[in-house]
From Swiss-Prot:
TM regions (residue ranges): 44-64, 69-89, 111-131, 135-155, 189-209, 226-246
Key word Calcium present: no
Name of the protein described by the UniProt record: Adenosylcobinamide-GDP ribazoletransferase
A single Gene Ontology CC term: plasma membrane
Gene giving rise to this polypeptide: cobS
Compartment(s) where it occurs, according to its Swiss-Prot or TrEMBL record: Cell inner membrane
Predominant location category: membrane
InterPro entries linked: CobS
Amino acid sequence: MSQFIRHYLLSLQFFTRIPVTGRLANWVGFSPAMLRASAGHFPGVGVLVGALVAAFTALLLFVLPRTGSTPLVAAALGTALGVLLTGAFHEDGLADVFDGLGGSAERERALVIMKDSRVGAFGAIAVMLALLCKVALLALLGAVSATLMVAALFVAHVLSRTWPLLTIRLLPHVGDAAGSKSKPLADQISVAALLTGFIWCFMALALVISTQSATEYIAINLTDTALLQALLSAVVASCVAWAVMARWFWRRLQGFTGDCLGATQQVCELAFYLGLAVGL
């Protein structure tokens, strides 16, 4: 259990701005092997981030005046909190990927561009569109049901952090290995770590499904069958998005970088919201 907590806190330290400092940080420790073992807790980080964002969004929906634009405001501020909690870690990956692969047809040149800390036109446009689409889709879900919007936020943050584990498992790491912060995560991710990630994901999905009957009084307005169909549509859409991204990385780069993992998380999160909306 002690090792489990250490790996989780190390993953939290790596993927978010949530402070793990002082004596706690000393107790957690660090090594490339530990960071590699912590990869399975990537979705577990999504559980905490998703819970915080979902709770904040639910609070906004409760305290703000109930108008037609309330879901839009709550979605925008909830999304902003998510960006703050992660330090725009995944959005930065999305920008770098689209700068590199959108701005160059050559593999080596694309990898160089992706390492550049400056943001180009392709990257800026990709991040702006992703944020706009995320807020718009969440507002759409909120117009159907406030509870549905909050539940979607929670599950999407977990599921979208699960698919990158498959990318790590199936594709080789490319680029500057020595200078890559993600290299320990890319080396020989174990089946146990992969299973840990999927257990986190299944727990999140089970929580939402099992609480359906308990939350009917706050107007999800969906039968159990309809909720399952909508969730299935969202999960499938997210999975398809992962497959498309993985194929793109293989075709263009013959592997992945840390930026590719962040971009995958962002695209899969968007696909989940879209799939859920279509499945309603």
